[in-house]
């Protein structure tokens, strides 16, 4: 699942539309997931009033937040809620839309670290990376519980999984962490930098 429902306030424009490799980031991420062998792909598209996303291929569902104004955690819940009835004992691989360095090889390393009933979250220098992680679909009810209590931290959701055994850690090397370089402001976006000139 691709998390693409954010408001991109720091960027000043919708990150799903930013171009990488001559295509919007959203379509790039779809291609990476398909190349990694994933067949059931959805996009967490945020609230109903979110501006339009780049057109996606037919059959890619756009999932809407069921909990208002609770950030990425609402997208995590939407994805798990979509996947759980289809694959109750499976997993949901979640990636943020604004990870232009993400690769098939990196995703395959992540996928290799899951186990029955247990997902995997990368960690780098002590900080979890929950927006490029795999969650067991059985955690859907826990995601609902967090949001019903207005707990919007995906970090806290992951920590609960680590404490109770349904998540594991992948300690990233410096090289592996480069795949999680993201674009948060115009200064992070190479095209924007080129337009600014030297």
Question: Where do the protein language model's features map onto the residues?
Answer:
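Nucleotide and nucleotide-moiety/phosphate-recognizing core
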Residues: 1-179, 187-197
């Amino acid at each position: 699942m691709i998390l693409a429902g954010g408001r991109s306030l720091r960027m000043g424009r919708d990150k799903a539309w930013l171009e990488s490799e001559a295509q919007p980031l959203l379509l790039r991420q779809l291609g990476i997931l398909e190349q990694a062998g994933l067949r059931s792909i959805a996009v967490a598209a945020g609230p109903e009033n979110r501006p339009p996303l780049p057109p996606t291929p037919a059959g890619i569902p756009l999932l809407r937040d069921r909990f208002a104004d609770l950030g990425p955690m609402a997208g995590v819940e939407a994805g798990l809620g979509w996947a759980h009835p289809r694959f109750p004992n499976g997993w949901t691989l979640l990636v943020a839309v604004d990870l232009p360095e993400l690769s098939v090889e990196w995703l395959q390393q992540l996928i290799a670290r899951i186990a029955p009933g247990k997902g995997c979250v990368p960690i780098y220098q002590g900080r979890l990376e929950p927006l490029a992680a795999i969650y067991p679909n059985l955690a859907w009810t826990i995601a609902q519980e967090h949001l019903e209590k207005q707990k919007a931290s995906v970090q806290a959701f992951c920590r609960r999984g680590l404490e109770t055994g349904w998540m594991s850690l992948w300690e990233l090397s410096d090289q592996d962490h480069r795949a999680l370089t993201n674009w948060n402001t115009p200064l992070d976006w190479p095209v924007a930098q080129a337009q600014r000139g030297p």
